[in-house]
Amino acid sequence: MKKIDSWLTKHGLKNRLTLVVIVIFIIFLILLFMFVNLSDEDTGQITITENAELRTGPNAAYPVIYKIEKGESFKKIDRKGKWIEVQNHAGTEKGWVAGWHTNLNIPADQSLSSNPLKGKTIVLDPGHGGSDQGASSSTPSKSLEKNYTLKTAKELKKLLNKEGAHVKMTRSNDKYVSLDDRNIKGDAFISIHNDALDSSNANGVTVYWFKDKQETLAQTLNSAIQKKALLTNRGSRQQNYQVLRQTDIPAVLLELGYISNPTDESMINDQLHRQVVEQAIVDGLKQYFSS
């Protein structure tokens, strides 16, 4: 006690009450500073700092619900990694936004600034081949599925190589390859097909997956193709195909139009349209590996 009195006297403080007041004042300043700098994350509200997308899940592989603009605010519901689940103030819409598009000071993923396909091994599986011609058209051109799956795969391979990806082909010419022999390892497996039905009315693109780990890739590619291709979008669907069942890597089977539909067939035959679809597949893969 004498030491405290001596310290108070030395610093011109006549009583302990003055010291208590100073301590309380310092604590008040600290609390005030903390309150002023309280982030909106703690208050349950976030603000969008740059134009972004509201998605159905916590990474860029999920489909976009709608575009959101800089300055909009949302109620924060949850957080997974660098992604924030939000709800609009009306309570009518929920979705996920990347945290680096908000005022929460979350750094962007480093992978977004580099080429996400560089060094990735992509397996391309042109359906059918050799004695297995696949589907065929009923038009005078008599288009064969096996020919166009191979053309698409070769053209897609060039685009992927430009992105720094290593591409493996289950076949690179018109030969028969068993389904068992198509089980090649990589970072992603893309089986390329054209659909067909007895009715010429069926049309469009379908993306198939089987295992749960394949669904995100399917949704991502379906969304990317939908943005660019002129073909009708039939969505992503679960189907027990052997090439999907037998692999342990992310895999999809793409039905890129109905060769039995004259309109779809003309687009399948058109190199420019194939290039649009192929670029959409590349975009989807880049988005998938950026997530």
From Swiss-Prot:
Name any GO cellular component annotation. Answer: extracellular region
Q: Where in the cell is it found?
A: Secreted
Q: List, alphabetically, the InterPro entries matched.
A: LytH, MurNAc-LAA_cat, N-acetylmuramoyl_amidase_3, SH3-like_bac-type
SMART domains referenced in this protein's UniProt entry, alphabetically: Ami_3, SH3b
The family assignment reads:
Belongs to the N-acetylmuramoyl-L-alanine amidase 3 family.
Q: Specify whether Translocase is a keyword of the entry.
A: no
Every copy of the MurNAc-LAA domain together lies at 122-286
Q: Where is the SH3b domain?
A: 41-105
What's the superkingdom here?
Bacteria
Pfam families the UniProt entry points to: Amidase_3 (PF01520), SH3_3 (PF08239)
Q: What is this protein called?
A: Probable cell wall amidase LytH
Query: What's this chain's function?
Result: Probably involved in cell-wall metabolism.
Q: Give GO BP annotations, semicolon-separated.
A: cell wall organization; peptidoglycan catabolic process
Which keywords appear in this protein's UniProt record, sorted alphabetically? Cell wall biogenesis/degradation, Hydrolase, Secreted, Signal
> Where are the residues of the annotated region Disordered?
123-147
Q: What is its main location?
A: secreted
Q: Does the keyword RNA-binding apply?
A: no
Which GO MF terms does the UniProt record name? N-acetylmuramoyl-L-alanine amidase activity
